[in-house]
Amino acid sequence: VRADLIERERARRTTDLAWPRILTGIARMSKNAVDIAMVGVAVGSAGIAGVGFASPFWGLAFAAGGGIAAGTIALVSQRYGAKRLGAVDQAVRSSAAVVVALTLPLIAIFWFFGADLVALLSNDAEAVALGATYLRVVAFGIPFAALNLVGSRVFIGVNDAQIPMVLRSGGAVANAVLNAVLIFGLDLGVAGAALGTVLSNALVTGIFASGLVAGRLPGLGELPVQIDPRGSYLGDVRELLDIGTPVIGRNLVWTVAEIPMLAIVALFGPGVVAAYVIARRIWGLMNTPGWGFGLASSSLVGQALGNGHEETAEAYGREIVRFAVAVYIVSAAIVFVFAKPIVATFAGGGSESVISVAVSLVSAACVAIVLQGVSGAAAGPLDASGDTSWPFYSQALGIFGVAIPLAYLGATTSLGLYGLYLAFLAETTVPAVLNYYRFATDKWKQVSRQHRPDAPA
């Protein structure tokens, strides 16, 4: 506010929605980092690599769930802004039906073909076996993880980010505790890490569902919204798919890209794979502000559009981009200075060579993450309006068109690890430029008029 980046009231509303989501992200990413450290201590670097190889497939839960959840927040926020609360119920029921239909088949695929899928990424027999074990078990948590994304977006769409923070952060803590018991207490290794993830996600889903239906939660009191489970589950499916399919594609870009990316990183050797997995976990932690600002932007812009206040929607979008970049600069500087002790903490006793490579990758990520602030925050208004195709194309171009080729050049030429450093930078630069350009054109406002509560069917 003092730097004149954002108007005071908009800063307050943005912060109210963003900080709980940021804390939730930190809790979840910290849990992931702790998982990696636990697996590293219990199984070694092969276990870290195995979990890393399984991660792209687990990421399908967040690709499908996150895509439909983008449609959820767009519809819920616009209908809430227009005071059409009955229409909120329909959006939530349809969202739940779609994510369950999308994710249930993945359980069977990963259970029966998990080993074959992980083997696509590496010829390291031990890492492949461990990754396949992890994937077969964790697959049962995919529908729960996707439903949790929808549940959290419902609350954020109605101006309440604290309840999702409490539930999902609590789930992350429960996950870490369960993993410690299962990995070390019962000596289940990577299977224990996967089982802990399944159980904790199922617990959070149950709490979300019971709270939304009852309209209240013990200890948290009345909720801002109550969902009637009776009624059609298909009414908003078409709109959800129109908005959510490009977001699923955008999420799948990285999930799918991880497969060739990890295969390319494997050409550097198992030590670099372990370092890359560690760096990616730390990247996830650094990226948590973007989740908060992106969702805050989607909610606030969506509510303004639902009220027909397009100028207010634009002001929120533009100022949240500035706010996000300022926060990213500060957080990236802190991580850059303390990169070595941070990596050593997450490495779980890894070798000095692994730690050294991971530190260099994290340092490169600190530069790239600032542009992620632009990309993610600029995508928020586009998601809120239903203009979700542009961020999908920009993400695909950045990763498949630039980042992966640079990584491959690093693995096959004298460019070496510099190829991975440049890949981090390309991954965020291209979407940042293209997403902000699309936001600046104002075409997203035109798209939003097709999805507002008073729009013709």
Residue ranges and their predicted role:
Residues 48-108, 145-164, 273-333, 337, ...:
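Small-residue-rich hydrophobic transmembrane alpha-helices
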Residues 123-124, 128-131, 138, 142-173:
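Cytoplasmic helix-loop-helix junction between adjacent transmembrane helices
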Residues 30, 42-45, 79-82, 157-158, ...:
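Helix-loop interface residues and adjacent transmembrane-helix termini in multi-pass membrane transporters
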Residues 39-59, 126-131, 190-195, 239-243, ...:
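Interfacial/gating helices of multi-pass transporter permease domains
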Residues 63, 175-179, 205-209, 285-288, ...:
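Hydrophobic transmembrane alpha-helices of multi-pass small-molecule transporters
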Residues 16-39, 137, 200-204, 208, ...:
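Transmembrane helical elements of multi-pass membrane transporters/channels
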Residues 1-18, 76-141, 190-244, 301-368, ...:
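Short alpha-helical transmembrane segments in multi-pass integral membrane proteins
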